Amino acid sequence: MADKGSGGSRLPLALPPASQGCSSGGSGSSAGGSGNPRPPRNLQGLLQMAITAGSQEPDPPPEPMSEERRQWLQEAMSAAFRGQREEVEQMKNCLRVLSQATPAMAGEAELATDQQEREGALELLADLCENMDNAADFCQLSGMHLLVGRYLEAGAAGLRWRAAQLIGTCSQNVAAIQEQVLGLGALRKLLRLLDRDSCDTVRVKALFAISCLVREQEAGLLQFLRLDGFSVLMRAMQQQVQKLKVKSAFLLQNLLVGHPEHKGTLCSMGMVQQLVALVRTEHSPFHEHVLGALCSLVTDFPQGVRECREPELGLEELLRHRCQLLQQREEYQEELEFCEKLLQTCFSSPTDDSMDR
């Protein structure tokens, strides 16, 4: 079978020239602009290389493949398959480390070494699973069951946040993996981490995984609603961790834009009042995303506009003062635009009754 040595997976360094080779003035993806294709690490890379090579030479005249080119292609495909198999073996080794029981009666040094090995395995898996083929193989190897069942609730924060990060990495834009993760009950655990974990890094990584499970994923969003995810998101925006606040507000804004049908639910939760309260806090770049979410909440939604007009909120005065603060400050132009849009939407109408009917 395949050579397991480090040289066994190497591809031929250059594609033998055809009668009319690709121009060296192409995309510049090869090192130094030499025109030699970079060896693909797996089938996905091989496919991308073939697409790129084909796009550089439109409509070439059909001609038989030379024996030299045929041999190169066979070697490239063999190496790509071998590289994929080797990465699967790496994942299996990582899962063996993660599946082991914690050493019984171990001393402090031994426990620290054990944790480092597990963290290293999770980090390697996160790197490998950036590739969608590897992410699918990881799930087929029952890796996701292990993450959700054991590592999201591990005692060490370093294991919890790495598990959450790996779940997000695998789930990004892959519906089949998202469905498996949701079926394992991961979203409930991730929301609990976001809401209650004592480690800020765990909370940030949990939010990343949640975002990967609910954006562009209807089943995930429905679970998110049933688990009162919007309340968890609002509490995250009220924390003192800047990264957590910004990412929570950004996710809220994204969900409002993509799913306007849930605006009524959010208004009934008092979201308008809570967002305005956040805007009243000491000014920070985070406010851009809060005002963006508020804009999304009132756009084409009269109930949101009416709530923004409530006199006790004092929103109009707040927005006008903020506009004055942000004038001539280039770095806050998006926030300024949100303020102006809110003023136009909520406070420029000649009559309040016109929006009620």
From Swiss-Prot:
<feature type="modified residue" description="Phosphoserine">
    <location>
        <position position="354"/>
    </location>
</feature>
<dbReference type="Pfam" id="PF08609">
    <property type="entry name" value="Fes1"/>
</dbReference>
<keyword id="KW-0597">Phosphoprotein</keyword>
<feature type="repeat" description="ARM 3">
    <location>
        <begin position="218"/>
        <end position="257"/>
    </location>
</feature>
<dbReference type="InterPro" id="IPR016024">
    <property type="entry name" value="ARM-type_fold"/>
</dbReference>
<comment type="subunit">
    <text>Interacts with the ATP-binding domain of HSPA1A. Detected in a ternary complex containing STUB1, HSPA1A and HSPBP1. Interacts with PGLYRP1; this interaction blocks the cytotoxic activity of the PGLYRP1-HSPA1A complex.</text>
</comment>
<dbReference type="InterPro" id="IPR013918">
    <property type="entry name" value="Nucleotide_exch_fac_Fes1"/>
</dbReference>
<protein>
    <recommendedName>
        <fullName>Hsp70-binding protein 1</fullName>
    </recommendedName>
</protein>
<feature type="modified residue" description="Phosphoserine">
    <location>
        <position position="349"/>
    </location>
</feature>
<comment type="function">
    <text>Inhibits HSPA1A chaperone activity by changing the conformation of the ATP-binding domain of HSPA1A and interfering with ATP binding. Interferes with ubiquitination mediated by STUB1 and inhibits chaperone-assisted degradation of target proteins.</text>
</comment>
<dbReference type="GO" id="GO:0005615">
    <property type="term" value="C:extracellular space"/>
</dbReference>
<feature type="repeat" description="ARM 2">
    <location>
        <begin position="175"/>
        <end position="215"/>
    </location>
</feature>
<dbReference type="GO" id="GO:0031625">
    <property type="term" value="F:ubiquitin protein ligase binding"/>
</dbReference>
<feature type="repeat" description="ARM 1">
    <location>
        <begin position="130"/>
        <end position="172"/>
    </location>
</feature>
<dbReference type="InterPro" id="IPR050693">
    <property type="entry name" value="Hsp70_NEF-Inhibitors"/>
</dbReference>
<feature type="repeat" description="ARM 4">
    <location>
        <begin position="260"/>
        <end position="299"/>
    </location>
</feature>
<feature type="region of interest" description="Disordered">
    <location>
        <begin position="1"/>
        <end position="68"/>
    </location>
</feature>
<dbReference type="GO" id="GO:0032436">
    <property type="term" value="P:positive regulation of proteasomal ubiquitin-dependent protein catabolic process"/>
</dbReference>
<keyword id="KW-0677">Repeat</keyword>
<dbReference type="GO" id="GO:0031398">
    <property type="term" value="P:positive regulation of protein ubiquitination"/>
</dbReference>
<dbReference type="InterPro" id="IPR011989">
    <property type="entry name" value="ARM-like"/>
</dbReference>
<dbReference type="GO" id="GO:0140313">
    <property type="term" value="F:molecular sequestering activity"/>
</dbReference>
<feature type="compositionally biased region" description="Gly residues">
    <location>
        <begin position="23"/>
        <end position="35"/>
    </location>
</feature>
